[in-house]
Design a protein with these regions (language model features):
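Surface-exposed interaction patch
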Residues: 22, 31, 68-126
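Extracellular adhesion/glycan-binding regions together with long Ser/Thr-
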Residues: 2-6, 61-70, 121-151, 155-159
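Short aromatic-cysteine micro-motif
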Residues: 248, 252-255, 287-485, 600
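C-terminal, structured domain-capping segment
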Residues: 72-91, 96, 139-186
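Short, polar/proline-rich extracytoplasmic segments that appear immediately after membrane translocation
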Residues: 2-69, 169-175, 180-186
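A solvent-exposed, charged loop/short amphipathic helix patch at secondary-structure junctions
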Residues: 325-351, 503-532
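N-terminal module-boundary/linker segments of secreted carbohydrate-active enzymes
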Residues: 187-301
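C-terminal, surface-exposed recognition/capping segments
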Residues: 388-391, 412-446, 451-452, 456-462, ...
Length: 601
């Protein structure tokens, strides 16, 4: 059919909005008037007045011919740049599209869109409306805003090769197109719960833990794999460290180390089951809890990680224990160089994690009264790590903000926290590190390296003078990451099949926000086949199907007889790793530990 013989009439309502969302608790809205009806530029500090923006037309209406090429479609162009005083800061703009009616659904695969710049030989992003559900917000593209103004044009048209063109005559489509602009540093700003003390590590001579102000720019830099760290200290020493900077924190005063995992969206690379050999850098964009959630459903779109939705609360991030939880159970800690707390069933592990913030469980209800021992108040929720929260850390680790490779293994058979074999699982023979030894065994009681990179004297718990910080087994490959996520003890997480209590010890499962559930209505197979039923809605971000088999880590799903997930693998397993997952019953086992997480209550 020739395009001049048949025209399709589309009404496209395109609302272009620029919104800058940060983790600041309060802000004033700044609106720039537009020459075009219904177009405004909305922003918040610190970008107020520092973003240059020229709007496209708010209303596009007209005859849209059937065509083969984008340039015959209808379009809108907008231009964006930043002022020179932001030249040292990363600013990103994401383009979003939302459909407001369902009239197009039967023909969605015929309606094409593209985003281009004047200089681009190929589109920056493209697709069809088949990727959209009514009312869903789809991120079309994410671009860095530079000091050079750049124009972007959005095109939409009907494919002339579509078989049933007559059915499209007179079709009206209501779409919204807008932008969100983010100042990256503000989107990773940690929420410092009362009792937490921001720290950095001075490794110039030994390892010295020092306090730092929460607004100090040297506290963290995720662009350089320097994740924000904080500690909990004893009640008697707390006043020495609170609200200080540069004060050395005595190791004996520290009760727990925690690492901030900031809220983000990630780019979907598969909706199926991955496998070994398909490892790739995970594309992550930090976001604030007040930003519109990304809810793409297809590869190439962005999806807000589910770990940052805690029940009905949107989180800017959470604090994860830097190490596996250690004992005693009556006074749990999160520290290096201590044996992990093991031999607890899942219900006891859950109750132990609650102790940090004075939590108790009654029936399914969990309440917090605070705990002066750790300095946490009732405004903090301390809980056992969920499966999705494990996934959030794993994905951040495998992005440009983390090690972006296989995490080294903790090869301590004594289950000492923070230890390292100096390499990945299956690649840590004793004679490869200790050249005066002949054994090819992959582990020993204490591991080979400490959390701060010191080589241990062979098969002892004493440090040598040899140090290599590149040998540490953290999610960043340096001292600022999370440890013990490959090897060490197995770690139970709160991930459960069909609300099955099993051998966990629970009488009643806690509130559903404390665990991820994998429904028997969906997962109807076995430990080896259930992964095939994963979808973005059920498993997205959990480091299950999306990363299955990465680095040959074991992949076995929960099912009716073994209803609880364990993660990370064991000190001696070649299939251990941050993407390892396996089923278990939830019972107490002598080599199973767990992880503690802190978030807003």
């Amino acid at each position: 059919m020739k395009s001049d013989k048949k025209k399709i009439y589309l009404f496209i309502a395109v609302v272009v909005i620029v919104g800058i969302l940060t983790t600041l608790s309060s802000f004033a809205l700044w609106t720039v008037a537009s020459n075009n009806i219904n177009v405004a530029v909305n922003t918040f500090p610190p970008l107020e007045g520092n973003i240059r923006y020229t709007e496209g037309h708010s209303i596009l209406a007209g005859d849209l011919p059937l065509c083969l090429n984008y340039f015959d479609g209808i379009n809108t162009t907008f231009t964006i740049g930043k002022e020179s005083n932001l030249s040292e800061h990363l600013v990103y703009a994401s383009m979003h599209l939302k459909t407001n009616d369902d009239s197009y659904l039967a023909y969605a695969d015929a309606i094409n869109w593209q985003i281009r710049t004047a200089s681009s030989a190929s589109p920056l992003a493209s697709g069809t409306l088949a990727d959209f559900a009514v009312g869903s917000n789809i991120m079309l593209d994410n671009i860095e805003v530079t000091t050079t103004d750049t124009s972007y044009t959005f095109y939409i048209w009907v494919d002339s090769t579509y078989g049933d063109a007559n059915a499209l005559a007179g079709l009206t489509i209501d779409l919204e197109l807008w932008m969100e602009v983010r100042y990256e540093r503000y989107n990773v700003r940690p929420v410092v719960n009362e009792g937490l003390i921001p720290v950095v590590f001075d490794t110039t001579s030994g390892t010295v833990v020092k306090t730092i102000g929460k607004n100090d720019g040297d506290w963290y830099n995720y662009d350089k794999q320097k994740w924000a760290n904080a500690v909990l200290v004893t009640e008697s020493s707390r006043s020495t460290y609170l609200n200080t900077s540069g004060v050395t924190v005595s190791e004996s005063d520290i009760l727990g180390y925690f690492v901030w995992i900031p809220r983000y969206r990630y780019k979907i690379w598969t909706t199926g089951v991955s496998s070994s050999g398909n490892e790739q850098e995970i594309d992550i964009i930090f976001e604030g809890k007040n930003e519109t959630k990304a809810v793409a459903t297809q590869a190439g779109g962005y999806y807000t990680h589910p770990a940052f939705t805690f029940g009905g609360t949107q989180l800017d991030g959470f604090w994860i224990g830097k190490f596996e939880t250690s004992g005693p159970a009556s006074l749990p800690k999160v520290k290096p160089d201590i044996k992990a707390l093991v031999s607890q069933n899942i219900s006891t592990q859950f109750a132990t994690a609650l102790k940090f913030a004075g939590g108790t469980q009654s029936g399914s209800t969990v309440t917090f009264d605070g705990n002066s021992t750790y300095g946490l108040t009732s405004k903090t929720d301390s809980h056992m790590l969920k499966n999705s929260e494990w996934g959030a850390v794993a994905y951040l680790s495998h992005s440009k903000y983390g090690a972006n490779r296989e995490v080294y293994i903790n090869n301590s058979s004594g289950l000492y926290t923070g230890r390292s074999g100096g390499n990945v699982s299956g690649s840590t023979p004793i004679n490869g590190t200790y050249t005066d030894q002949t054994s090819t065994t992959q582990y020993n009681s204490y591991g080979f390296y400490t959390w701060d990179g010191y080589l241990l004297n062979y098969n002892t718990n004493t440090r040598s003078s040899t140090r290599n910080l590149n040998k540490v087994a953290s999610t960043t490959g340096n001292i600022y990451g999370v440890y013990d996520m490959s090897g060490g003890a197995y770690e139970y997480v709160m991930g459960n099949f069909a609300n099955t209590i099993g051998n966990s010890g629970f009488t009643t499962l806690p509130d559903s926000k404390y665990y991820d559930v994998y429904s028997s209505d969906v997962f109807t197979g076995t430990s080896t086949t259930n992964i095939n039923f994963c979808t973005l809605a059920t498993c997205g971000g959990h480091a299950l199907n999306e990363t299955a088999g990465w680095y040959s880590d074991s992949s076995r799903f929960v099912y009716s007889s073994s209803a609880w997930f364990r993660r990370g693998g064991y000190y001696n397993g070649s299939a251990s790793g941050i993407f390892y997952f396996y089923y278990d019953s939830g019972t107490n086992v002598a080599n199973f530990s767990f992880r503690t997480c802190l978030s807003d209550a």
